[in-house]
UniProtKB/Swiss-Prot annotation:
Signal peptide: none annotated. The gene is yqgE. The lineage of its organism: Bacteria, Pseudomonadati, Pseudomonadota, Gammaproteobacteria, Enterobacterales. This is UPF0301 protein YqgE. Belongs to the UPF0301 (AlgH) family. GO terms for cellular component: cytosol. InterPro entries: AlgH-like.
Length: 187
């Protein structure tokens, strides 16, 4: 099972404060483990504009149609000072990894320098930190009913309101997660 370019959708019984009702976009999954970004936990009082200001990046030429007040996500509990930018192609940046035909993750400053300009990728999600699982850990958590999985959907990743992403990601596989009981069993 390879879950790269899939969503992990937290089951209602998952009560860890960070992962409760979370949707994680899996950027990498291989025999050694997995890495992903939480896409529905905005950091309080931090927007893309604030990141650009902190890094002394001024978008030029500025495209006024591009909003810089979008929230920055808490991507996960590891390396919370490190930025990850999920975006649609192209991946012409210094440190980009193509996740799927339609999704790229970049960690280099050059992608931030395009945000707010006509050169910005069409869709962008900025996160600080990431989530990681060791070999076999994610598979075991899925067997333990901590997560549902669904193929990633770009609309949910980039366009769905943050508050709706958990519910809408579960709907991708026909699940109304709001009506699920808090404890799941094995059949």
């Amino acid at each position: 099972m390879n879950l790269q370019h899939h969503f992990l959708i937290a089951m209602p019984a998952l009560q860890d404060p960070l992962f409760r009702r979370s949707v994680v976009y899996i950027c990498e999954h291989n025999p050694d483990g997995a890495m992903g970004l939480i896409i529905n936990k905005p950091l309080e009082n931090l927007q893309i504009e604030g990141i650009l200001e902190k890094l002394k990046i001024t978008p030029e030429p500025r495209d006024p149609a591009i909003r810089l007040d979008k929230p920055v996500m808490l991507g996960g509990p590891l390396a919370e000072d490190r930025g990850f930018i999920l975006h649609t192609p192209p991946s012409r940046f210094a440190s980009s990894i193509r996740i799927s035909d339609n999704t790229v993750v970049t960690t280099s400053r050059d992608v931030l320098e395009t945000i707010g300009t006509p050169k910005q990728p069409a869709d962008v999600l900025v996160a600080l930190g990431y989530a990681s699982w060791e070999k076999g850990q994610l598979e075991q958590e899925i067997l333990d009913n901590a997560w549902l999985t669904a193929p990633a959907d770009l609309n949910i990743l980039f366009k769905t309101p943050i508050a709706d992403r958990w519910r809408d990601a579960a709907k991708l596989i026909g699940v109304d997660i709001l009506t699920m009981p808090g404890v799941a069993g094995h059949a």
